[in-house]
Swiss-Prot record:
InterPro entries: YbaB-like_sf, YbaB/EbfC. It is found in: Cytoplasm, Nucleoid. This is Nucleoid-associated protein RSc1192. Coiled coil: none annotated. Gene3D superfamilies: Nucleoid-associated protein YbaB-like domain. Keywords: Cytoplasm, DNA-binding. PANTHER family: NUCLEOID-ASSOCIATED PROTEIN YBAB. Homodimer. The keyword Glycoprotein does not apply.
Length: 115
């Protein structure tokens, strides 16, 4: 590989690193909502997995309501939010990694970037 090609790859890698840092900052601001029980339980979190809010419909807190059901609904809403955050992160970070260009072919087979 020629010296100029290496310098070009280094510059491209540095630019991609800067783009990834900016994207990670943006992801910490993007909120997704996980829902379960037909909307009775909602979890709002960022794409960096910081939970912002948990909403539970008052009907689930009524006397005689099943505690285990409520726990299951909270867990399901949380898992739904995590899946949505992961999907959003993959989508947004895909725009950054599409800039790899020729560098993508230099990565080992099955190599996954850390995001």
């Amino acid at each position: 590989m020629m010296k100029g090609q290496i310098a070009g790859l280094m510059k491209q890698a540095q630019q991609m690193q800067e783009n990834m840092k900016k994207m990670q900052e943006q992801l910490s601001q993007i909120e997704v909502e996980g829902v379960s029980g037909a909307g009775l339980v909602k979890v709002v979190m960022t794409c960096k997995n910081d939970v912002k809010r948990v909403s539970i419909d008052p009907s689930l807190l009524a006397e005689g309501e099943d505690k285990e059901l409520l726990e299951d609904l909270v867990a399901a809403a949380f898992n739904d939010a995590v899946r949505k955050a992961e999907a959003t992160t993959q989508e947004k970070m895909g725009t950054v990694t599409s800039g790899l260009g020729g560098m993508a072919s230099m990565l080992p087979p099955g190599f996954k970037l850390p995001f």
